[in-house]
Structure formats: C-alpha cells, structure tokens
Regions:
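Pepsin/retropepsin-fold aspartyl endopeptidases
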Residues: 1-126
Length: 126
C-alpha cells in the first residue's frame, strides 16, 4: 500500500480496507497505528450501516493526553488486501483525530508489517 495524504497533505500510512457490517461491505480508510491497542473508527460508518455501535462491548482507551475515550467493540469481518478475517473494531464518538485508526489487536498478530517511510510504502505479509 502507498501512503495517502492526510492533514495538510502530509503522506501518512493510511490504507483502504473492507469492513462487513450487517452483510454489507464498506470501504474504509484507516491510519495504521502501531501504538494503538485497538482499531477505532468514527461512528458515521456504523450509522450508515444502521449498526447500533453502542451495543458493542464498552471499554475505555487512554489516549495521548491521558484522557479515557469510550470505545464500543464489535467483532467484524474485514478484508485487508487479499486476506479476510474477523477482528475487534471499536467505534467512538470521542475519536479526536480526523481519520479512522487501525490498531494492533487482530491485525499486528496476523501480519508482518513493514513501514518504508522513505518510499511512502507500508506492506503486510501473512
């Protein structure tokens, strides 16, 4: 995957992936974050899919400034490249960044991930 422009046009490790919600697939772009325990998406995706995201398992994640952010976890099928698998995806109305976050749980234990910053490439090897 090639890095994508984010805030102010700066290239970041943002990748496309498919997420299945209620038997329908959605294309989502997410920032690959090796410091995030869980994947956390903005709730607009859940609302579009008519998923009551607050029905998920609630947990609180500590963000960079020490504040606890409520996250509602759902086990969803995703497609990353050619691989399809189920992993925990959280939704939070308090996500304080402008992009979805792809975290470690269910992702980093499945792939060898290489960030090639100088070339703007991120690779996933299963």
């Amino acid at each position: 995957f090639f890095y994508q422009p984010a805030n102010r046009g700066i290239l970041q490790p943002i990748i496309p992936l498919g997420v299945q919600i209620e038997n329908r697939w959605y294309l989502v772009k997410a920032y690959v974050d090796s410091g995030a325990d869980y994947s956390v998406f903005k709730p607009e995706i859940a609302r579009e899919a008519e998923l009551n995201y607050r029905a998920g398992r609630r947990t609180n994640l500590q963000v960079g400034n020490g504040v606890l952010m409520p996250v509602y976890l759902h086990n969803l099928e995703i497609q990353l490249g050619r691989e399809r698998f189920t992993c925990p995806i959280g939704f939070s109305h308090r996500l304080g960044v402008s992009f979805n976050v792809l975290g470690k749980q269910g992702i980093f234990d499945r792939f060898k991930i290489c960030f090639l910053e100088s070339q703007g490439i991120i690779s996933f090897e299963s």
